[in-house]
Amino acid sequence: MRHRVAHRKFSRTSAHRISMLLNLSISLIKHERITTTLPKAKELRPYVEKLITIGKVYREKNLVYGKRLLISKLKNIDATDKLIDVLSVRYKSRNGGYTRIMKNGFRKGDCAPIAIIELVDRQIVSQS
């Protein structure tokens, strides 16, 4: 039975796992779309959505505490600024569901399932 199993461990120590989620979340916030394995994407989704919700709540109230809280969680000022200035405005009327996970086949080397995780309602830039 899976009772009281909170999250995946990924065969890593807790510090390594937290660092991995932190790096993935910073990349997702900066680039708005990343490719990773499916279990990592599924584990990343609630982590990033909570950060976006924190940014939305504290932007509406215009509190410095929210920015400091996000800086302490993300440890990256550029990602924090983008989250507060761009993403919280974009998702002002959306109550959750800020990310989308799309399956993208399997990796060639070890046949691991690959997924694309992206922020919804993002601006698509043409490469012409």
Curated annotation (Swiss-Prot):
One of its GO terms (biological process) is translation. GO terms for molecular function: structural constituent of ribosome. Pfam families: Ribosomal_L17. Transmembrane segments: none annotated. InterPro entries: Ribosomal_bL17, Ribosomal_bL17_CS, Ribosomal_bL17_sf. SUPFAM superfamilies: Prokaryotic ribosomal protein L17 (SSF64263). HAMAP family: Ribosomal_bL17. Belongs to the bacterial ribosomal protein bL17 family. Part of the 50S ribosomal subunit. Contacts protein L32. This is Large ribosomal subunit protein bL17. The lineage of its organism: Bacteria, Pseudomonadati, Pseudomonadota, Alphaproteobacteria, Rickettsiales. The gene is rplQ.
